Each structure stands twice: as C-alpha cells, then as structure tokens.
Amino acid sequence: MFLGTYTPKLDDKGRLTLPAKFRDALAGGLMVTKSQDHSLAVYPRSEFEQLARRASKAPRSNPEARAFLRNLAAGTDEQHPDSQGRITLSADHRRYAGLTKDCVVIGAVDYLEIWDAQAWHEYQQLHEENFSAASDEALGDIF
C-alpha cells in the first residue's frame, strides 16, 4: 500500500528518487503515466497491466473509451529504478506535470502520484476546505 507524502528533488537529468519504503514494491518495474490534475501516476507494472486490461475491454465503438485508451497507452512510460531508486522522467512527462526541481510524491493507496511542489500546494489549498464534504459525496457508505 502506498501512503504518505515525500519531497524528493528532480535532478538536472530528469531523475527522481523514489521513497525508499516503496522501492521493493516497484522493483519489478513500474509504469509512469499522465494522470488527472496535471500530475503523474506511478503504478507497479502488475497493477498497471490490470488497469490496461480493464480499459481495453471497453467497446471500441465508444469515442470516449478510444480516447482514454489512446491517451493511457501513449502517455505511459515503463521504468526500472536504478540502484539508488531513481527513475528518469521523460521530457514530455516533466512538461505535462510542470515539474521543477521541487517535487512531491504522494501515496494514493494502490499507486503513487508525482506533483510539482507548488502545484501540489495550490491543489491542497483549493481542495482542503472541501475534503470532508467531498469524502461524504464521493465515498458514500464506505466510511
């Protein structure tokens, strides 16, 4: 399970060090993909494969399903962390997420999200007040 908030730095070569506590779960390979709110999602390879299989079952006659599958596949990059736990984020991914040197990696239960630190701060400011109401609406009877 991926939980917590971490603040790694992006180096000049576009490498980001993953939190040490997640490296074992990601050692078998991982997939970096564009996500909502101009963040990046990092999935263990096995988790991403399940997601892609489910997405590929959508009817190809549905334009939204085709667009989602195309964007998912085209916006995904397979990575293997180096011996120091670093991954290299593509220039396209860095540009999409607006990444600067200061980044935030958050656990999102079954995957990680990578944010530019300033964008994450702004997102939290915007959504923090609505957290309780949103959890009631979005999660219903789960809690």
Curated annotation (Swiss-Prot):
Subcellular location: Cytoplasm, Nucleoid
GO cellular component: cytoplasm; nucleoid
Ligase as UniProt keyword: no
Gene3D superfamilies: Transcriptional regulator MraZ domain
GO biological process, one term: negative regulation of DNA-templated transcription initiation
Family membership noted in the UniProt record: Belongs to the MraZ family.
Name by which UniProt lists this protein: Transcriptional regulator MraZ
Limits of the SpoVT-AbrB domain: 5-47, 76-119
Gene Ontology molecular function, alphabetical: DNA-binding transcription factor activity; transcription cis-regulatory region binding
Keyword tags: Cytoplasm, DNA-binding, Repeat, Transcription, Transcription regulation
InterPro entries: MraZ (IPR003444), MraZ_C (IPR035644), MraZ_dom (IPR020603), MraZ_N (IPR035642), MraZ_sf (IPR038619), SpoVT-AbrB_dom (IPR007159), SpoVT-AbrB_sf (IPR037914)
Oligomer and partners: Forms oligomers.
UniProt organism field: Mycobacterium ulcerans (strain Agy99)
Keyword check for Transcription: yes
One Pfam family per UniProt: MraZ
